[in-house]
């Protein structure tokens, strides 16, 4: 709601003359006051009717990915490639179909000669690993194309299935003499390693010396009684002692 504009009309105000004594007439200027709402609300005119939030639909990440013209050949969760071959399409076009049928995996596997097998099946015969003469049409067991590569010898356990021939038994024939543990070997004494600078002085032996050691003698009594000066000098300098070694 717009407020009315206030217009102030010009007025004549008498004023005394300072010098001549005649009154002067002063005319006030016409001032137009604009209300504050109209002066500060100019931005309201630029506001238009806008839709509320949620009016527009924003495409999600999945929808954006489906709009990609390039077909993906991978997927998440480690599922691998899932691009359908031409023969498994829902609406195949005759020009897209191959001109031949691909061979089966089992047929290709049967044509290959396997040199190994699973744990519960024995290995193939070595004679089947070589090229055969297709012109031979004999029953099994009537001929031997190739001899056995290594003569087989019986083993005690199924774990040792080596086809290599063992050592001949003549190396392990018993000999005369005591068996292991029936005698004791006498090892020759070995000299200890010593230094050339070894001291020859005997260790921890009594030393035959006539020099008395500490405590081997006792002080003798001063008899007759000496003066205090001589007795003091005897105690300080050990002038009077009695050797108890007895030599």
Swiss-Prot record:
<dbReference type="GO" id="GO:0001939">
    <property type="term" value="C:female pronucleus"/>
</dbReference>
<dbReference type="GO" id="GO:0042393">
    <property type="term" value="F:histone binding"/>
</dbReference>
<dbReference type="GO" id="GO:0001940">
    <property type="term" value="C:male pronucleus"/>
</dbReference>
<dbReference type="InterPro" id="IPR010736">
    <property type="entry name" value="SHIPPO-rpt"/>
</dbReference>
<comment type="function">
    <text>Maternal factor that plays a role in epigenetic chromatin reprogramming during early development of the zygote. Involved in the regulation of gametic DNA demethylation by inducing the conversion of the modified genomic base 5-methylcytosine (5mC) into 5-hydroxymethylcytosine (5hmC).</text>
</comment>
<comment type="subunit">
    <text>Interacts with histone H3. Interacts with histone H4. Interacts with METTL23.</text>
</comment>
<dbReference type="GO" id="GO:0003682">
    <property type="term" value="F:chromatin binding"/>
</dbReference>
<protein>
    <recommendedName>
        <fullName>Protein STPG4</fullName>
    </recommendedName>
</protein>
<keyword id="KW-0963">Cytoplasm</keyword>
<keyword id="KW-0156">Chromatin regulator</keyword>
<dbReference type="GO" id="GO:0005654">
    <property type="term" value="C:nucleoplasm"/>
</dbReference>
<dbReference type="Pfam" id="PF07004">
    <property type="entry name" value="SHIPPO-rpt"/>
</dbReference>
<dbReference type="GO" id="GO:0001674">
    <property type="term" value="C:female germ cell nucleus"/>
</dbReference>
<dbReference type="GO" id="GO:0044727">
    <property type="term" value="P:epigenetic programing of male pronucleus"/>
</dbReference>
<keyword id="KW-0217">Developmental protein</keyword>
<keyword id="KW-0539">Nucleus</keyword>
<dbReference type="GO" id="GO:0042585">
    <property type="term" value="C:germinal vesicle"/>
</dbReference>
<dbReference type="GO" id="GO:0072529">
    <property type="term" value="P:pyrimidine-containing compound catabolic process"/>
</dbReference>
<dbReference type="GO" id="GO:0005737">
    <property type="term" value="C:cytoplasm"/>
</dbReference>
<dbReference type="GO" id="GO:0001673">
    <property type="term" value="C:male germ cell nucleus"/>
</dbReference>
